[in-house]
Amino acid sequence: MTQDPSSQISWSQTIVLSIVQGLTEFLPISSSGHLRIVSELFWGKDAGASFTAVVQLGTEAAVLVYFAKDIAKILTGWFRGLFDKKQRGFDYRMGWMVIVGTLPVSIVGLLAKDIIRDNLRNMWITASVLIAFSFVFIAAEKWGSKRRSFDQLTMRDAVIMGCAQCLALIPGVSRSGGTVSAGLFVGLDREVATRFSFLLAIPAVLASGLFSLPDAFAPDAGQAASGMQLAVGTGIAFALGYASIAWLLKFVGSHSFSWFAAYRIPVGLLVMALLATGMLTA
């Protein structure tokens, strides 16, 4: 069966959307929301959730490389602890915290895949959530104590942040925004919440990207991409994602997440205005 040319993603889309993915994936401004906005604004069509999920593999590879030492330490401690109770230290517990914290989004993502793809990728929803969730950032900064260090992380924190990660399935929320806000609410230091947010995202996003790989070539919704386009897009997302991680960790050391709210609210209002005037379609 011949693929309809109009349903094939273009190279310009591939490059631009991969740049957007790399720059926004780790910032609390919603990469999925920005991809949706840019796709509609410049091409009048949605590239699709499958393309997004696969290109996310590039940004998640950036996390693996950036936190390679931390990940190796956690994995080593976890495996040692499985076979020797005397070696069940913090890294062993951290391994379980990442696993348990990943379960909520894995379950919800699988069960609600069709609902997310068919009903939640609406531009009005994206714009509304960009605005509404900005006030969650502000509240988390205002009422979170931000005192607890990395070695004070608990399984309760992992469960709460893991549940918050489910909100990232809605375009406009932001994976890091949801999990970091939850971390701030339970009293974690801003940088601690951000670092754990990155670690927590790895299993779920890698699984989502690999699971969506076949669908990206012939999607039920959105546009199809070639293997070369997916490879180039993933590479671009990796390079920019790595730089974005380094920048964000430095930024949160001395700046409030409320700065991102100051960006999200005008963007959400602008999108609503474009929708209302017919310059964008929902």
Curated annotation (Swiss-Prot):
Keywords: Antibiotic resistance, Cell membrane, Cell shape, Cell wall biogenesis/degradation, Hydrolase, Membrane, Peptidoglycan synthesis, Transmembrane, Transmembrane helix. The chain crosses the membrane at residues 96-116, 123-143, 198-218, 229-249, 260-280. GO terms for cellular component: plasma membrane. The keyword Membrane applies. Its main location: membrane. It holds the Pfam family BacA. It is an enzyme of class 3 (hydrolase). It is a multi-pass membrane protein. GO terms for biological process: cell wall organization; peptidoglycan biosynthetic process; regulation of cell shape; response to antibiotic. It is found in: Cell membrane. One of its GO terms (molecular function) is undecaprenyl-diphosphatase activity. Its EC number is 3.6.1.27. Catalyzes the dephosphorylation of undecaprenyl diphosphate (UPP). Confers resistance to bacitracin. NCBIfam families: PRK00281.2-1, undec_PP_bacA. This is Undecaprenyl-diphosphatase. It comes from Corynebacterium diphtheriae (strain ATCC 700971 / NCTC 13129 / Biotype gravis).
